[in-house]
């Protein structure tokens, strides 16, 4: 890693890409454009419990919302996402999420939100917002990853939502090999037979 890529401050390399919500006229929840997830005009889950759910994503500002101990603090893939719309986090975002989730869940049979393309859960109150929304809308689901410590205040809040909603809140703790529901970097931990597996996308075995 180059010297310029280490010890980055707690904000994105692309501050002009952070969208101030008072000036932002677009929705904060975006339909997924990731061809690995869906190539359809309306991106939907193809198999499993959430088959038919429409896929949405939320992108926050990397590092500004992330724990400093994140293994990928310096080499976050957001470093290569110059044009991503990073949504300003805070109370206005949470207000917008409430309104947009209500509209989407009233429109589609099911909605599943990827948290977060960039960024992380930034407060206990923010985690509890998703807990509230999952309780209110039974056709809502969430999946994603967090760099928060399993035992931190935010980590404990995330665990509480997982415990309450199971697969509807499929958030994995990153680089926490002692946690059953975790996602671990291959350069840190080798998969153990019977305990872990490599994502099929990484081995070319996905459909």
Language model regions located:
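Class I S-adenosyl-L-methionine
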Residues: 1-207
């Amino acid at each position: 890693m180059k010297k310029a890529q280490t010890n980055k401050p707690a904000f994105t390399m692309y501050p002009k890409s952070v969208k101030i919500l008072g000036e932002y006229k677009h929705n904060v929840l975006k339909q997924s454009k990731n061809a690995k997830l869906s190539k359809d005009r309306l991106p939907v889950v193809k198999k499993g419990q959430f088959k038919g759910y429409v896929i949405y994503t939320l992108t926050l500002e990397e590092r500004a919302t992330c724990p400093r101990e994140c293994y990928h603090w310096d080499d976050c893939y957001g470093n290569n996402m110059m044009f991503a719309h990073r949504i300003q986090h805070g109370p206005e975002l949470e207000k917008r999420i409430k309104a947009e989730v209500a509209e989407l869940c009233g429109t589609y049979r099911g909605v599943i939100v990827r948290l977060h393309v960039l960024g992380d859960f930034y407060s206990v109150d923010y985690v509890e917002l998703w807990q509230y929304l999952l309780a209110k809308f039974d056709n809502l689901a969430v999946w994603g990853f967090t760099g928060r410590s399993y035992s931190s205040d935010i980590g404990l809040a995330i665990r509480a939502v997982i415990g309450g909603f199971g697969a509807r809140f499929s958030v994995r703790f990153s680089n926490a090999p002692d946690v059953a529901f975790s996602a671990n970097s291959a350069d840190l931990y080798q998969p153990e037979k019977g305990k872990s597996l490599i994502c099929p996308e990484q081995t070319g075995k996905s459909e």
